[in-house]
């Protein structure tokens, strides 16, 4: 079930990566399981940070990675889409929190150095919206569910608590989809790490996240051009 994400991962990196071509040279010519293993070997080596400490931690990285492009002192809140002062951090829930895009409870991990502090999976978030999203999986809700508001204004997100579903606002759907796809590829159950698996059925079992079809849709803006990429990746998935 994991093979399709290799093609999707490569497609997104080929179009968006600023790394030299040599970064992925070890996987050229590979396919299927061999390709997935080659990519895993490349991305599994990275700096492990502590969740919170007096030295460089995940707070510090998010202040840079998610800085407001118009004011670097602020960070952008992922679901609200507005800036907030970065240095204040949590500040008794008056500041911001760190959202695990792949929820801890759906991955069997906490906040120990490793998967729980992988900043690829962390985003600044308002505490209330962090709690509202909870561990809901991502899907398109259309006009269903309820709108997500922040400070009296609509954010563009929606949620359905009884169904355990959350639809992010359009501007961030692609980013969140690629984070989830990265987590599926990066965490394979090696060295005591969890084996994270993407599925297309909701609430399947521990260490899984859904829905594949919605993440594909989130990743590609649905235009004439991207339609052919979407068909291509589904074709590759079937072949694998």
Where are the regions that the model predicts?
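Sec-dependent signal peptide recognition
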Residues: 1-7
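Low-complexity, intrinsically disordered or signal/transmembrane-proximal segments
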Residues: 3, 217-219
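N-terminal signal peptide c-region/cleavage motif recognized by signal peptidases
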Residues: 11-13
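N-terminal module-boundary/linker segments of secreted carbohydrate-active enzymes
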Residues: 15-81
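Short alpha-helical segments and helix-capping/turn motifs at coil-helix boundaries
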Residues: 56-64, 82-84, 106-111, 163-167
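Short, His- and charge-rich active-site/binding loops that engage polyanionic ligands
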Residues: 75-77, 81-95
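Domain-level detector of nuclease and nuclease-like folds
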Residues: 90-214, 222, 237-240
């Amino acid at each position: 079930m994991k093979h399709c994400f290799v093609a999707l991962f490569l497609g997104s990196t080929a179009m968006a990566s600023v790394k030299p071509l040599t970064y992925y040279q070890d996987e050229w010519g590979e396919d299927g399981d061999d390709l997935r293993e080659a990519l895993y070997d490349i991305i599994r080596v990275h700096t492990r940070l502590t969740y919170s400490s007096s030295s460089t931690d995940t707070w510090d990285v998010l202040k840079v990675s998610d800085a407001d492009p118009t004011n670097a002192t602020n960070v952008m809140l992922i679901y609200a889409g507005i800036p907030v002062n970065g240095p204040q951090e949590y500040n008794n829930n008056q500041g911001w929190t760190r959202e695990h895009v792949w929820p801890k409870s759906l991955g069997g991990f906490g906040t120990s150095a490793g998967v729980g502090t992988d900043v690829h999976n962390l985003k600044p978030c308002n505490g209330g919206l962090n709690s509202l999203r909870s561990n809901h999986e991502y899907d398109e809700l259309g006009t269903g569910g309820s709108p997500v508001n922040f400070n009296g204004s609509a954010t563009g997100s929606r949620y359905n608590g009884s169904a355990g579903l959350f639809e992010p606002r359009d501007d961030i759907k692609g980013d969140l989809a690629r984070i989830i796809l990265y987590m599926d590829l990066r965490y394979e159950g090696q060295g005591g790490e969890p084996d994270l698996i993407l599925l297309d059925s909701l609430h399947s079992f521990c260490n899984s996240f859904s829905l594949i079809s919605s993440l594909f849709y989130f990743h590609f803006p649905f235009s004439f051009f991207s339609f052919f990429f979407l068909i291509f990746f589904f074709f590759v998935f079937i072949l694998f």
